[in-house]
A protein has these predicted regions:
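Long beta-strand-rich cores associated with HINT superfamily self-processing modules
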Residues: 466-493
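Extracytoplasmic/peripheral linker and loop segments enriched in polar/acidic and small residues
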Residues: 98, 270, 307-309, 361-374, ...
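N-terminal lobe/hinge region of extracytoplasmic solute-binding protein
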Residues: 1-35, 155
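Surface-exposed binding/hinge segments that line
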Residues: 61, 72-138
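Ligand-site clamp/hinge motif
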Residues: 154, 178-224, 236
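Aromatic- and charge-enriched surface segment that lines or borders ligand/interaction sites
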Residues: 29-79, 113, 250-252
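Structural transition elements
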Residues: 279-322, 341-345
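Gly/Pro-rich hinge or "lid" segments in bacterial periplasmic/extracellular proteins
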Residues: 116-186, 190
C-alpha cells in the first residue's frame, strides 16, 4: 500500500526492483550465495544516513532483530521466520531464544551474512520488503516510542528525505537526498503527497494541475478513459470472500460453499461495477507476479480451475440442494463485513444480489466497517463472511498459499487440511526446496485443494485506474510489495 511506498521513498534495503520487477542491488553492491543456497553474504556499498552516519551491516542486524523480537509483536515478523526461513527466527518469535541468536551477522561494517534453515528461491525478492530494511540503532534509541512519527524521528538513507509529516495531516513532503549514493540519477527534486478522501475532488485537483498522479474509482473511468493520461496498472491484490468455516456450522458445509462460489458472476463485478481494468480471477493466486522455473506465469491460465469456481447457476443450484438436504435447512442468513470504502461496498452489494438471486432462501446482510476494524474482526474470528484482499509481499505463489496453512494468522476462517499442510511444508522446508520444478507442481496441487474445497471465493485481481500527468515519465508500477517507485521518475516543466 501507500505506507510501504512512502517508506521506500526514503529508505533503501539490500535489494530493489528494476523496471521489470527483478531483484537488483541497492545498498548491497554485490552478494554471494553459498552452494547449498543457505548462506547469503551481502557486501554493502558506501552509503549514508541523513544524519551523516554510515549505513553499516549492524543496522540490518538491529532492524531484523527488532522485527522478530516478541516484545515488539511485529505483524510482519513471519516474513523472517515462515517466509524467509532465517535461522532461529521462529524460535525467537516464540520466546524460546534471544534475539541475538538470529541468523544474521555483521561480519564487519560492510559485510552482512545471513543464514537460512533451507534454500529459499525467492529470498532476494524479500529484501525490498520494508521489514528487511536497516534501522540505525543509535538514532532509534534517541527516539524510542516516537520513532517514525515525525520528520525529526525519521532517518533516511534512500533517494528522498522526509521533510514534512504529521500523523494526522492531510499532506506530507519529501525532498531529494543530496547524499544518496545514486543521487546523480534521481531526477525529481521531491515528492508531495496529499490525502484526499473524496475521489472526485482528487480528480479535479489532477485536472487543475495540483496533482500529477491520482487513483480513480470505476465511475470516474468512464469520464476519462479516452484521456491519454489515463492508465490502468496491475496492483497485485486478489480480492476474495473468506467464509468463517470454523465458527459458522453452515459454512463448514463444503457443498454450501461451492454453491456460493458458483453463484458469483465475476465478469459482472469487474465489467459493470469496477470498470478500472480489474480482471475476474478464478485462482487462489492471481496472475502477473510469480514466474516459475520455466519462465511462465504461475496463474496465466485462468481456466485451469474454472470448473471449481466459475459462474454456473446450474451447478450452484445443484450444490445448494445437496447442502440444504445435508444441513436440514431451506434458508440461510449470513452477515458479511466489508470495508467502508467506495469500491468494496459496491462489490459487496453486487455479491449480495448475485447470491440471493441464484440461491433462493439465502440472505446476505452487509455490515460496513472501517478497514482497520474489519481486519481486526476477521483476525479475531468475529465474522461470518468477509470481503477482503491480499497483495503479494514477495514474488512467489507462497505469499498467497501460505495463508491457508493451519494456524496461519491470515487464515481467518480457521480452515485446516492435513494434505494441504503437508504440501506446503514440503515446499517450504522439505526436499522440494531444492527441486524448483517439483515445488512448482506441488504448489499447483495445493492451490487446487483450496479452490476445490471453496476455502475462499476468489473474485478479481485488482487493477489501479490512475491518471498520471503527461509531464511525468519513469514511474515504475509493480504488483509486488511496492506499487509505485519514483527513483527513475522525471517531470518536464
Amino acid at each position: 500500500g501507500t505506507s510501504f511506498e512512502v517508506i521506500a521513498d526514503y529508505t533503501d534495503g539490500l535489494m530493489q526492483m528494476d523496471a521489470d520487477g527483478a531483484a537488483v542491488p541497492a545498498l548491497a553492491e554485490t552478494y554471494d550465495i553459498s552452494e547449498d543456497g543457505k548462506t547469503y553474504t551481502f557486501h554493502l556499498r558506501d552509503a549514508k544516513w541523513s544524519n551523516g552516519d554510515a549505513v553499516t551491516a549492524a543496522d540490518f542486524v538491529f532492524g531484523w532483530q527488532r522485527a522478530v523480537d516478541p516484545a515488539n509483536a511485529s505483524e510482519y515478523s513471519y516474513m523472517l521466520s515462515d517466509i524467509g526461513q532465517v535461522v532461529n527466527a521462529a524460535e525467537i518469535i516464540a520466546g524460546e531464544k534471544p534475539v541475538t541468536d538470529l541468523g544474521v551477522t555483521a561480519v564487519d561494517d560492510k559485510t552482512l551474512e545471513v543464514q537460512l534453515n533451507v534454500p529459499v528461491s525467492y529470498f532476494l525478492s524479500l529484501m525490498y520488503f520494508p521489514t528487511f530494511y536497516p534501522v540505525n540503532e543509535a538514532f532509534f534509541n534517541t527516539c524510542k516510542d516516537t520513532f517514525g512519527t515525525s520528520p525529526d524521528t525519521v532517518l533516511s538513507n534512500g533517494a528522498f528525505i522526509m521533510t514534512d509529516y504529521q500523523p494526522a495531516a492531510t499532506a506530507f513532503e519529501l525532498t531529494k537526498n543530496p547524499d544518496y549514493y545514486d543521487a546523480a540519477n534521481i531526477a525529481l527534486d521531491g515528492l508531495a503527497y496529499q490525502v484526499i478522501k473524496d475521489s472526485q475532488q482528487a480528480l479535479m485537483s489532477f485536472q487543475t494541475g495540483a496533482l500529477d498522479l491520482t487513483l480513480l474509482n470505476g465511475e470516474q473511468v468512464d469520464q476519462v478513459k479516452d484521456d491519454p493520461q489515463f492508465t490502468s496498472v496491475g496492483a497485485g491484490y486478489l480480492w476474495y470472500i473468506s467464509p468463517n468455516i470454523d465458527a459458522v456450522p453452515e459454512l463448514a458445509n463444503e457443498n454450501l460453499r461451492k454453491a456460493m462460489t458458483f453463484a458469483l458472476d465475476r465478469d459482472a463485478i469487474t465489467g459493470d461495477v469496477l470498470k478500472d481494468g480489474s480482471a475476474p480471477c478464478y485462482t487462489a493466486v492471481p496472475p502477473q507476479f510469480a514466474t516459475g522455473p520455466d519462465g511462465s506465469d504461475f496463474s496465466a491460465d485462468q481456466t485451469k480451475f474454472a470448473d471449481a469456481c466459475a459462474f454456473d447457476a446450474a451447478k450452484a443450484a445443484e450444490y445448494y440442494e445437496t447442502a440444504k438436504s445435508e444441513l436440514g435447512k431451506d434458508s440461510f442468513s449470513f452477515d458479511m463485513i466489508v470495508d467502508a470504502d467506495d469500491a468494496p461496498q459496491k462489490v459487496a452489494q453486487v455479491v449480495k444480489e448475485q447470491l440471493e438471486t441464484t440461491l433462493p432462501g439465502l440472505t446476505v446482510n452487509l455490515t460496513v466497517e472501517p478497514k482497520k476494524q474489519r481486519v481486526q474482526d476477521m483476525q479475531d474470528g468475529n465474522f461470518q463472511l468477509g470481503l477482503t484482499r491480499w497483495g503479494p509481499d514477495y514474488a512467489d505463489p507462497m505469499t498467497y498459499l501460505g495463508m491457508w496453512v493451519t494456524g496461519n494468522s491470515n487464515n481467518y476462517g480457521l480452515w485446516s487440511d492435513a494434505e494441504f499442510d503437508s504440501i506446503i511444508e514440503e515446499c517450504t522446508t522439505g526436499d522440494l526446496c531444492t527441486d524448483p520444478e517439483g515445488r512448482w507442481a506441488a504448489l499447483y496441487d495445493a492451490e487446487a485443494i483450496v479452490l476445490e474445497q471453496a476455502v475462499i471465493f476468489p473474485l478479481y485481481g485488482q487493477c489501479n485506474a490512475e491518471m498520471i500527468s503527461s509531464a511525468v515519465t519513469g514511474v515504475d508500477f509493480h504488483p509486488v510489495a511496492l506499487n509505485r517507485v519514483y527513483k527513475r521518475a522525471a517531470k518536464n516543466a
